[in-house]
Amino acid sequence: MPWTQGESPLIKQHRKQSKRPYLFAYTLLFTVTALLVYSFYWMAGKSFIWVVDGWDQHFKALVYYSQWLRAGARSLLVEHRLHFPTWDFALGQGADVLTTLHYYAIGDPLNLLSALVPTRWMVHFYDIMILLRIYLSGLFFSLYCFQMKKQNGMAVLAGALSYAFCDFVLFAGVQHPYFINPRMYLPLLLIGVEKVLAGKRPYLLIVIVAVAAVSNFYFFYVLVLLTVIYVAGRLISLYHGEWRQMGMPLLKIAGASALGVMMSAVLFLPVVGAFLSDARIAVDQNSILFYPLRQYAYMPAEFLAHTGVSGYTYTALGFSVLTFPAVMMLFRQKKTNTLLKVFFVIGIGCFLIPFAGKVFNGFSYATNRWCFGLAFLVAYILVTVWPSFVTMDKRDCRYLFVGLSVYLVVCLLIRYSRVTQAFIVLGVLFAMLVLWQQRTKQGAGLSDTAIQVVALAATLLSVVNNSFWLNAYSGSNYAARFVDQKDLMQNFSATAENAVKAVAKQKKVTEFYRYTGHELPWNTDLNQHLSSLQYYWSLSSPQISAFRWDMNMREYLLYRYHGLDERASLTTLASTRFFVKKEKSKDIVPYGFSKVGTRVVNRSAVQNALDAFAEEQGTDKPGAADTKRLQKKVEKRYTVYENDYALPLGYTYSRYLPQAEYQKLSSLQKQEAMLQGVVLDKAPQHCASVQPQLTAQEVPFTVSCNSKDVTQQGNSFVVTKKDSSITLKLEGLSASETYLSLRGLTYAGTSEYTLYNDDETIDPLNRYTQTDWDLLPYNDRKKLKDDHWYWHEPATLNIKISAAGRSNTLPLSTPEYTWFSGRQDFDVNLGYGEEGVSSIKITFPSIGIYRFNTMDVVCQPMDNYADQVNALKEDVLEQIKVDGDRVSGSIQLDTPKLLCLTIPYSKGWSATVDGQPAELLCANTMYMALELDAGQHTVQLHYQTPLLNAGMGVTAVGVLLFVAVIVVTERRKRRDA
């Protein structure tokens, strides 16, 4: 091996050359396999950008990161200072660049290459990097095999392809490109461990720990757990329980790992700090003893084939065809490879038990993103057992025949494992069994080399088979869920922000502003460099999350939200100037926003369509009718509204509301109170507290069930047919916003079959009796029974609420939901109306019981709104300059006031007033404030990522220690040579 110590240069050169044929063979086979596996994307004209997180997060973050890197390099070349802005107002209302985008782009060392790629080619870079990560994961697996003295090239090739193209990669690797990274690091980490155990240099372990920690804090945690299990097993195996002998190797591994973490601290510390302060950490996720029965029903077939069970738990195995007989042969061999057997039993046990998935997920919810470790193990078992496929005798063949037959019967008996793709793989295995059986006859069958070639070909084809059933149109058509290559960059640029920018330009708006909208594409603000009220990144501000929780926003994810429910007061207090929506959308527009105009945001795409049609018809340009028809099909039209009461980035209060008094108010009272006084944790020196004048009123109503499929039972509604509805009759207030306020809202679902159990709790009107059941056709009864057997409660529901031609949706999650936050209190804005609302319709989407503690209708008169906002606008921050992580402005005050800055609160911000340090207060839960005396003031704000300086210091010490380790180690090696 290239790393072997004590060898002459000639021997080292020979070892390097001996691996070149393998490298060539692996590269060739990988290329062929990748072309076949991903051909379904290319034939469909698809990129590897998933339409959900791939498009909404990963790709947009990568484009931003490449521009961010170039901006930093430009600052060095032009300004002669290296400066990377660490704050950007285009991350929602504003967020830390390093900690927010680390998970998506910044952590991956390979993404540094993006600085060299123009934005127009970024989609190709994105796709190529996915293939490169997969290639490297298989290559590094091969290196581990060689480190462990596995010298059969075909065996290692089969294992590498199995590891590189298992179902986890086919499914999750293109969804989330950085899920592939830990697959690259794991074999290198284990090689590093093996080197330390062999008394060799620890450099590789130190460097890979540093790279893994920098790359992704989440998967670094997973890698640590996997490595700890591996090290424990290897130490016990090597030293046979002699605990004293284990101490020194364990100390060396721990020391090398700690040094690697120190070297990574420049990014690792800030990101971990942000993670530990994230609102999701405080959420007590629901624990379950077992997965839903349906998930277990998929698992037999999932071992060898893609079944579609993956979902949010990433229960994705889909190993290559020979891994199943390899595992069988492993357990057939007595008193050998004991550690592999133990690891396999542990791995399968963890795979079956949700608590293990919870542990691997940082004690959050249960998910199996760690199963790449199981894929590594199974692929290595295949490499280890491979020689048995050449030396197999009749008893081995009978043993495999019985095992495969049992596996076949299990798949046939279980509904969700009764899938074609599994039977195809089993057919290949039985065919292989025939070939092995033939070889047991004297002088018959294929040669040793030929049988290995056939086995390797079967491995490759089984991977392609899994890809077919996952990606092909005739299979699950998974590739259809990815973004089209054609016009991708045009669509990337043609966003609602173009309409906002056009209106801002028309209005000659030069100062800082924000925009908002409902159901806009996620994170388009980032690449358009506009600040907005939408956000969808994994790490979020705990202050913003707390604020939205206080306001009972209608959302069930703490880190993904659109706007502020179009509530006028909150939207204005957030310095929002524009509201944008699709032209024909019926989205609620906040009170006080006036229509400015409608803009087409994709004119280039429209022109391309017109040019293509003209060329097809052989004319200079389409006729008027065709032009109108094509425009109607292609145009993306957005309507922009401007806030008549817009507030700037900094506005002032003359009074404050103590946090303790604020918390005594209801959520709707809180939003009204914030128009009258800024909410502070501590009393300012020169401003008095306020006693807010609250005008919101609860309105009495009566409930009418619109059919016998929904029944009111006290504080609950029992629904026996989906999409059943109720109507609230009331006399709402005029010139008011109207809210439906729900407290303690929960849902308990039931299957349709259960309705026939004569249980008045779920069927209070006895409409589903035994007689009704007996009258159902046999096929209907059979289907209801089968569905009930695998039924589990819906994880999310969308309750539709409408009034006066306006509608809103209340998304409700249950404890079954992977990211259940525990939120049960909601205030749903039904918009502003000059006339009072007379009825509210609530539509329940699923069968079950909807319970609540209280349900109220609240009207918020807007009579005082204009005066309250204008009072905040009397004295504002002017001449505002926003330059990444620096904000400055000036203000003139006649009396002492509190300057509220609508910048999300963070300890990374510092302020000076007239050149003197000033204390930044947390204001209105999520913003910042400065207490100012009367007079003219210059305000300057500066941001630096929390713990970044500390991380730099630790990294510097770590690098120096690493250099010292190298010097000491090499001197010792030369001395001992």
Explain the meaning of each model-derived region.
Residues 30, 134-148, 153-238, 249-272, ...:
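Membrane-embedded helix bundles of polyisoprenyl
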Residues 91-93, 99-103, 461-486, 502-574, ...:
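Extracytoplasmic/lumenal acceptor-recognition loop(s) of multi-pass membrane glycoenzymes
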Residues 110-115, 528-659, 663-672, 676-700, ...:
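A cross-kingdom signal targeting lumenal/periplasmic-facing segments of multi-pass membrane
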Residues 219, 339-355, 361-491, 799-801, ...:
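Contiguous transmembrane helix-bundle modules in multi-pass membrane proteins
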